[in-house]
Amino acid sequence: MSKAIIKFVRLSPTKARLIAREVQGMNAELALASLQFMPNRGAKFIANAISSAVANGGFEPEEVVVTSCRVDAGPVLKRFRPRARGTASKIRKPTSHVMVEVSKPEKKEA
């Protein structure tokens, strides 16, 4: 089993979790292929984490399975936008931590 962590990704954790759920349990090669054609911005970051986890373990993508794909919330960058009548409103720029674990599938005994 090997893992990869990408921290402080400028992406909302709720949007990234939608993609992470799709990939969990998939073959790594199939997951990378499906992420390549997803229109979401977070798909690129999760694909990078999967390929990094595969490389960290010294595996080939076709021989491993994505056992766990987690997206945790990171710190929120707070900014202000000027508004009417001299007021200001808050802008929240959320960040995420992407954690991916890959391992070889266990052989089922018949």
Curated annotation (Swiss-Prot):
GO terms for biological process: translation. Keywords: Ribonucleoprotein, Ribosomal protein, RNA-binding, rRNA-binding. One of its GO terms (cellular component) is cytosolic large ribosomal subunit. Residues 84-95 have a biased composition (Basic residues). Pfam families: Ribosomal_L22. The keyword NADP does not apply. The keyword Ribonucleoprotein applies. Coiled coil: none annotated. GO terms for molecular function: rRNA binding; structural constituent of ribosome. It comes from the Bacteria. Residues 84-110 are annotated as: Disordered. This protein binds specifically to 23S rRNA; its binding is stimulated by other ribosomal proteins, e.g. L4, L17, and L20. It is important during the early stages of 50S assembly. It makes multiple contacts with different domains of the 23S rRNA in the assembled 50S subunit and ribosome. Part of the 50S ribosomal subunit. Belongs to the universal ribosomal protein uL22 family. This is Large ribosomal subunit protein uL22.
